[in-house]
Each structure stands twice: as C-alpha cells, then as structure tokens.
Curated annotation (Swiss-Prot):
The protein's required cofactors: FMN
One term of GO molecular function: FMN binding
Annotated keywords: Flavoprotein, FMN, Oxidoreductase, Pyridoxine biosynthesis
PROSITE patterns according to UniProt: PYRIDOX_OXIDASE
Cofactor descriptive note: Binds 1 FMN per subunit.
Protein name stated in the entry: Pyridoxine/pyridoxamine 5'-phosphate oxidase
Record: residues binding FMN: 61-66, 76-77, 83, 105, 141-142, 187, 197
Sequence positions that bind substrate: 8-11, 66, 123, 127, 131, 193-195
Reaction(s) the record says it catalyses: pyridoxamine 5'-phosphate + O2 + H2O = pyridoxal 5'-phosphate + H2O2 + NH4(+); pyridoxine 5'-phosphate + O2 = pyridoxal 5'-phosphate + H2O2
Biochemical pathway: Cofactor metabolism; pyridoxal 5'-phosphate salvage; pyridoxal 5'-phosphate from pyridoxamine 5'-phosphate: step 1/1; Cofactor metabolism; pyridoxal 5'-phosphate salvage; pyridoxal 5'-phosphate from pyridoxine 5'-phosphate: step 1/1
Length: 214
C-alpha cells in the first residue's frame, strides 16, 4: 500500500471571510449549494448522515438531500433501516457535505423527525417507477439476503404485482426525515492547513456566528 503520510494537497482555490457570509446560515448553504451545482459536480446533493443508537454506537452512510428550507434538511429512506432504528432511539444527527473540487465542506447538526405522510407520498410518486418498486423490494433494509438472485426474484415478483399503468403505493415503512438544524459549520480549505471555519449556533430566534480555529 502507498505510504499515505506523503499524500496531501494544498488548498488554494478561495478564502472565506466573515463579511462574505450571509447572516442566515440557510441562505449561506443555499448559495454554496447553487455554486456546487453550477460547478457540475457529481451528485452535489449527496450527504453523509451520521447517527448513533441508544448505546451511543455511531454509524454513517450516504443519502441524498431532497429539500433544504426553513423547516430543515430533508432526506428519504426506509424507516426499518439501521438509520431508522437509530433515529427512533436517538432522534438527532449530523450531516456532512464535502465538495472536493470547491475545497469546501458544510456540517449541520440537529434534531430529526419524520416528515408528514402526505409529503412522503408526494415525493414517493415523483420517483422513477423502478425506484418505487425497489423501495418495496429492499425490506427489511440492512437484513441479510441469501444472494443477488433472491433479491432480483423479489423485484421481478413486484413487477408482476404492480404491472405498468398501476399505481404503486408508498410502503408504510418508507418515508422522509427532516433535520431541524441547530448548528452549521462552513469550511473553506486554505494553504498550509490554515483553513477558514465559521460556525453558526442557534441563539434564541437568531444565530451566533463565530470563526473557529482551523
């Protein structure tokens, strides 16, 4: 294996100053997100979601952002998945967006709750038909499966159960979560590891903004 101690990059693309920041962290995030989209990055809406169970054992995985507004950050998943069980026992999470080409990172921490069923229904029926069937097929999510053939057979059976032209119902075990963000951090890589970091922390009805040591 390569000697990893010799591998490093120097970040020189941009700087981040206090006067550059929007006083509203959601607007700051939306601005950066739009820049990531305009930069034609691969899945800039992919985020790493970290949760922990009742005993504090952490786990992390990649999910897709499906909404970002005053209510919070929204994603969809199987409620019976590992993350679903974590969030039922410990309804808080941290998410991470890393846009390497922009040398930027955003962290957000908050409490998590399920979105209303009507909202989950609306999104489910906007998904490609094959993805709707896959939501039914991949349950119980994270459980062992004998082999790929068993999974494909289940998927094929669902194709027969819901032929083209029929409505596929959203399964009760699948839907959305929303992270109500209490803390944001914006990171811009800088030369010599002297990075720019700013944290927004909830302070009453507003936000306290601090520059952090890199």
């Amino acid at each position: 294996m390569t000697d990893l101690t010799s591998l490093r990059l120097s970040y020189t693309r941009a700087e981040l100053r206090r006067e550059d920041l929007n006083p509203d962290p959601l607007r700051q995030f939306q601005g950066w997100f739009e820049e990531a989209q305009q930069a034609d990055l691969t899945e800039p809406y992919a985020l790493q979601l970290a949760t922990a169970d009742a005993q504090g054992r952490p786990s992390v995985r990649t999910v897709l952002l499906r909404g970002a507004d005053e209510r919070g950050l929204t994603f969809y998943t199987n409620y019976e998945s590992h993350k679903g069980h974590d969030l039922a026992a410990n309804p808080q999470a941290e998410v991470l967006f890393y846009w390497a080409e922009l040398e930027r990172q955003v962290r957000a921490f908050g409490t998590v709750s399920r979105v209303p069923e009507a909202e989950s229904n609306d999104y489910f029926h906007k998904r490609p038909r094959e993805s709707q069937l896959a939501a039914h097929a991949s349950t119980p999510q994270s459980a062992p499966v004998e082999n790929r053939a068993a999974l494909e057979a289940k998927f094929a059976a669902l194709h027969e159960q819901f032929p083209e032209g029929t409505t596929i119902p959203r399964p009760a075990f699948w839907g959305g979560y929303r992270v109500q963000v209490q803390e944001w951090e914006f990171w811009q890589g800088r030369p010599n590891r002297m990075h720019d970091r700013f944290r927004y922390a909830r302070d009453g009805d507003g936000w306290r903004l601090d520059r952090l040591m890199p």
